[in-house]
Amino acid sequence: MISFLARIKFAPGDSAEIDESLRILATASRQEPGCVSYIPHRVEDDPDTVLFYEQYQDEKALEAHHNSKHFKEFFTSALQQKIQEPKIEKLVALI
């Protein structure tokens, strides 16, 4: 199992556009073979920051996600220009 926590800070004031893009991305990502969990969260006291909790069965599933049409479209869209501080952390389960 591969797990990630991705924190992405966007430029202020684009929450409606971001929410719609994330809805499309999450819906498509959850349908991928090998995607166990894909949940975007808005940080309560920082509305311009989104956290993604992602889990994949294996490296093959993660690679398929990174090569998917919806992933590429999200990261080549106009929103890409609004990302200010991306941080990706790979997680290791304790139990």
Regions found by a protein language model. Give the residues of each.
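N-terminal first-folded block
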Residues: 2-30
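Short, well-ordered beta-strand segments in beta-rich or mixed alpha/beta enzyme
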Residues: 2-8, 39-66
